[in-house]
Structure formats: structure tokens, C-alpha cells
Amino acid sequence: DYISCRIMNLFVETFFNNAMITELFLVMRASGVDTFDILVYLHEHTELYTPAIKEIIDRFILMTKEDLYDSRKEAENVLNNPDIVQKHLDNELGINELLACKADLYLIFDDINHLIFRAAKDILVTNNKLTVSSEMFLGQLCLFIGCRKKDFYKYEDEIEMDFDFDFKEIDINGYDIDLDNIDEFKCQKKSLRFHHTSFQQKIIKSMINININTPV
């Protein structure tokens, strides 16, 4: 089913490409759970979607269907119409629904972050691998990823948060951590400060100014 494949493509773009949630996927892989299995679980369990996520996916499906033609002949007629082609070139027609909806999903980062972690934990429960310690760690990893990657465009903001796991050491290990051994990384509460350097702020500000009116 074409629409089903397109939805999976949206999930791959949103959660996997550009390393958006890579820390979770690395931990899960080290614990015997494949990344694709998590994405398939998301695809199959639509009941987990928040209203905001469901609205974006429904819009993505609608836009995808609008791009389809009833016949090859109809598609050829459109392609052979110079006026329609020119309107696409002038951005008067057409939209990259994949990029548009990926951006919309990023803007509700808390929703998608909690969704992917919910899927991961459900799989661990099914495999009888979710312990008190691993559940606690995944909860804090979810917060950690949110602090690092949510609202990047608020480049002057600073966030400080306490954690019960040594995320600096975990990061050094490349998140190649089997959840069965997660207690080894427990520590006294450590406070981490998340912020952009002045150089990073300059780059982000420049990219926002360049792309603010760019059509998707």
C-alpha cells in the first residue's frame, strides 16, 4: 500500500534521519531491539498518537493522496501542460509534504519524543526486558534528548537539569549500553547545563534568516 509506505517514510525522516533520536536507537540496538522494529511498532499502533500527531499524519495522508492521479494518461496530461509546470517552478503549486510534515512534527517535539520512547518501552515489556532501572533510565534519557534537541531555534536559552545517570560517560561510550547493565552508570545526582556556544548561536541565527521564507 503506497500510503502506508509513505507514512513509514515520514517516520524514518522524523525519527531516524539527522540523528534526531539516535541516542535511544543506539541503546535499544545494544539491548537487542532493532530500530526498524520500533518504527514498525509506531506505524501499527496509531492509538498511541497524541491528537497533535494524528492531525499532522492525517494532513500528510491527505496531501499525499492529492498528488496521486487516477491514470497514467492524467499524469501525462499534467506533465505536458507548460502552464502547470511553470507554476510548480514558481512555487505557486505543489508542496513537499514530507518536509512540511516532518517540520510540523519537530515543532511538537515533546509529543514525538514521548511517543518513540513509549514504543520502545512497550517492546521491552513484550520481551520481558523492562526493569525498574531501565524504565527509570529511559525516562531520563527522554528528558536528556529533549534538553539537547528541542527548540533549537531558541538559541539563547539555557536549560539546567539533574540526572541520576552519568550521561557524560554514557555519551563517551557512544550509547552502546545494554539496558541489562544500566545500573553501572547510576550516580549521585549530576546537574547538566544545556546551551549553545556563541559560534553555534551565530550559525543557527544565520540559517534561520536564510531559510525563513524558503518554501518546502
Predicted features and spans:
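Generic structural hydrophobic/aromatic packing signal, biased to beta-strands
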Residues: 2-5, 9, 24, 38-42, ...
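Residue-level signal for secondary-structure boundary elements
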Residues: 13, 17-20, 36, 50-54, ...
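Polybasic, proline/glycine-rich intrinsically disordered low-complexity segments
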Residues: 40-79
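Charge-dense, extended regions
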Residues: 72-216
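A structural motif corresponding to the C-terminal lobe/cap of the Radical SAM core domain
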Residues: 1-38, 180
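Short, surface-exposed, charge-dense and proline/glycine-enriched linear segments
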Residues: 31-33, 47-61, 163-170, 187, ...
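Hydrophobic, Leu/Ile/Phe/Ala-enriched alpha-helical segments that form helix-helix packing faces
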Residues: 9-12, 60, 64, 116-127
